[in-house]
Amino acid sequence: MRVILLGAPGAGKGTQAKFITEKFGIPQISTGDMLRAAVKAGTELGLKAKSVMDAGNLVSDDLIIGLIKDRLAEPDCANGVLFDGFPRTIPQAEALLKAGLEIDHVLEIAVDDEEIVKRMSGRRVHEGSGRIYHTIFNPPKVEGVDDVTGESLVQRKDDVEETVRLRLKVYHDQTKPLVEFYSKLEAQNGKPKCSHIPGVGSVEEITAKVLVALS
């Protein structure tokens, strides 16, 4: 079972990805991890990727597809994989298709932009311990202060509203069109099975919907 999990930053993909990999016993593969592993191992593709990155350039989709093919040939991928952060664009999805790498399921965790902005921009972190609070959903006892140490909480750069909205725009421009791309494929070929899962509610409720979609 090969699964692509789509959703905007802050939609809760990480939680559901953990559930899918544990429930179905499949690895989560990310292009970043594959690149680092190939470079470290000094494989032919790894050396090519290293020379591209050392020159300050982006690694081509063809090279990434080569890495994915190598990774899928490993024993732990025999029952399937969960793709993490790939494909991000239509050309990457087309490259997967051209390479004959079939996808069984495409899940979109859908959350309204304003809900995501509320979720992410309300996060506050205690840098020393990594404890995470939220101004609405999990506030500290005293505003802006860590419950344990009494030290100040900070807002990470990634959680600033302006940054969140920028990341959402990139998602809508580049990655959201994949939902339509795969829906058309499903209409034509009966595969992959595309599922739209509302990402609002308790973790258990969303997980139950994910399980139904993959069954």
From Swiss-Prot:
Protein localization: Cytoplasm
Region NMP, residue ranges: 30-59
Superkingdom assignment: Bacteria
Catalysed reactions, semicolon-separated: AMP + ATP = 2 ADP
Pathway assigned in UniProt: Purine metabolism; AMP biosynthesis via salvage pathway; AMP from ADP: step 1/1
Stored Pfam families: ADK (PF00406), ADK_lid (PF05191)
InterPro entries noted in UniProt: Adenyl_kin_sub, Adenylat/UMP-CMP_kin, Adenylat_kinase_CS, Adenylate_kinase_lid-dom, P-loop_NTPase
EC number: 2.7.4.3
SUPFAM superfamilies recorded: P-loop containing nucleoside triphosphate hydrolases
GO molecular function, one term: ATP binding
Region spans: LID: 122-159
Binding annotation for ATP: G10, A11, G12, K13, G14, T15, R123, I132, Y133, G201
Amino-acid positions noted as binding AMP in the UniProt annotation, renumbered to this chain: T31, R36, N57, L58, V59, G85, F86, P87, R88, Q92, R156, R167
Subunit-level organization: Monomer.
Full protein name: Adenylate kinase
Organism, scientific name: Pseudomonas syringae pv. tomato (strain ATCC BAA-871 / DC3000)
